[in-house]
Amino acid sequence: MLKSVGVILVLSSPSGCGKTTVANKLLEKQKNNIVKSVSVTTRAARKGEKEGKDYYFVDREEFLRLCSNGEIIEHAEVFGNFYGVPRKNLEDNVDKGVSTLLVIDWQGAFKFMEMMREHVVSIFIMPPSMEELRRRLCGRRADDSEVVEARLKGAAFEISHCEAYDYVIVNEDIEETADRISNILRAEQMKTCRQVGLRELLESRFPIED
């Protein structure tokens, strides 16, 4: 049986489109087929968090060293702490045939598409409409009206980049969206270009006679 190299599955969407819920549902449905990327961070470990499972915990100096050496592909600063995606883990997973899920914004997604194009499968999750997105954001009751408007403006800008992704899915139902992504993942894993040893198999079992 042929084995395939791992896929780097990148999910992006505006705030309020359900990407985190979809990602968790996908990991539940495909628990033996894909793992979530483990980020490097400079923040202190919280109670119950485990090194290598939740995050890789490093100090600021080490994080900056990793960035300067190209060992961190994409990073951001949040509330004074750095978070980044380690290159080695992704490359190791690809080589081992393990697919990896990344949930990142469009800028981070574009960086991955540029640096690891042959392994990246990018999916943009859309809201059914801007009106529905407004309803969802207001329904969370976590932000005031100014923040909601800012999120909607940002969403429109993010959506304007969706055509650069491999797939666009309108998220009307979490289960259905997760199922669609599961189907995409399985199909991408089976692509001819990702089948390890295909040429050797053809030459050994199906030789062309002169």
UniProtKB/Swiss-Prot annotation:
Pfam families: Guanylate_kin (PF00625). The keyword Oxidoreductase does not apply. Residues 6-186 form the Guanylate kinase-like domain. It catalyses: GMP + ATP = GDP + ADP. Its EC number is 2.7.4.8. InterPro entries: GK/Ca_channel_bsu, Guanylate_kin-like_dom, Guanylate_kinase, Guanylate_kinase_CS, P-loop_NTPase. It is an enzyme of class 2 (transferase). It comes from the Bacteria. Keywords: ATP-binding, Cytoplasm, Kinase, Nucleotide-binding, Transferase. The keyword Transmembrane does not apply. SMART domains: GuKc. This is Guanylate kinase. It comes from Anaplasma phagocytophilum (strain HZ).
